[in-house]
Structure formats: structure tokens, C-alpha cells
């Protein structure tokens, strides 16, 4: 388990869950060198731009990409408000599964995408349907949540079959 703490104005902080059907999802990768190491001078510029877009209310939600790639990030973003995603036809599976540590998936309104001003890959569109659509493949949100919860269900059960006490 790890976590980080920082100080910020609450008005400058966003949450990771998807906000609205019709919004676009974009993967923003940090610049890396031939050895796949971050080019820190360029990374700083990318992070500064993301921060400005968040403060300006342009980026609606964001999630840091981890070991499960953009696919994991998008799924966890969708779980919060139970919104679905249709991935763009141009997106390949490797675009979604490559870890790309230090990078982000961001949600923006369609009308604001041109304001990004940093390289990004359009991943797809947020929908109000409770499913993920990638080409001909469809996974319901319920299936995805159940699969996500399953590994730790025995350790941290989300429900019990014990006696229920009704309190007046």
C-alpha cells in the first residue's frame, strides 16, 4: 500500500470518477527517452499543462496510469458514477494495456478537447450505458466490478449472510 499527500486549494482538486456522458477520454503520456526513462524537463511541462487545465475546469476527471495501463484507469474511473465507455475504433489493445507509468487518462468535454495543447491519444467516449465497448467486445459494468472485487472478497467481504438486526 502506498499513498502521497500534497497541499492544494480544494477548488483546484478533482476526483477520478467519470462525470458526464458525451465527454472524451484522452491518454496523456509523459515524454521518455530511448531507455523509456522520463525526460524530466518535458514531464514538468506536461504536468504544468495538466494542472492548468484542471484549475481552469477543462479537465473534468483524471486518473494516473499504473500497472494495468489505461484500461485499468478507465475502468476504475467508470466504477464511481457507473458510466460506460465506447473505445474509438483506432485504439489498439496495446494502447490500453501498456503501463505508461507517470501518464494519465483525462476526461474533457468534446468542445474543449482542442484546448489540450499537449500530445494525447483519444481513447473513447463516456456513455450512460453501463458497459465497456471495444470493437465487437462488450463487457458490462457489473461484470467488470465483480471481476475487480473478486480477488479480495474473502479478505474484505462486501456483504455478509449473517443475522441482520433491524434498529428502530
List each model region and its residues.
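Intrinsic low-complexity, intrinsically disordered segments enriched in polar/basic residues
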Residues: 13-14, 44, 163
Amino acid at each position: 500500500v502506498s499513498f502521497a499527500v500534497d497541499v492544494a486549494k480544494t477548488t483546484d482538486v478533482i476526483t477520478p470518477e467519470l462525470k458526464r456522458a458525451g465527454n472524451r477520454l484522452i491518454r496523456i503520456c509523459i515524454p521518455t527517452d530511448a531507455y523509456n526513462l522520463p525526460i524530466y524537463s518535458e514531464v514538468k511541462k506536461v504536468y504544468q499543462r495538466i494542472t492548468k487545465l484542471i484549475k481552469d475546469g477543462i479537465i473534468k476527471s483524471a486518473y494516473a496510469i499504473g500497472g494495468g495501463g489505461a484500461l485499468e484507469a478507465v475502468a476504475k474511473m467508470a466504477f464511481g458514477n457507473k458510466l460506460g465507455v465506447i473505445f474509438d475504433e483506432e485504439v489498439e489493445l496495446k494502447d490500453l494495456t501498456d503501463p505508461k507509468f507517470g501518464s494519465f487518462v483525462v476526461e474533457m468535454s468534446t468542445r474543449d478537447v482542442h484546448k489540450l495543447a499537449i500530445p494525447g491519444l483519444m481513447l473513447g467516449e463516456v456513455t450512460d450505458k453501463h458497459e465497456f465497448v471495444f470493437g465487437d467486445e462488450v463487457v458490462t459494468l457489473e461484470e467488470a466490478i465483480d471481476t475487480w472485487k473478486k480477488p479480495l472478497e474473502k479478505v474484505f467481504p462486501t456483504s455478509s449472510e449473517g443475522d441482520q438486526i433491524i434498529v428502530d
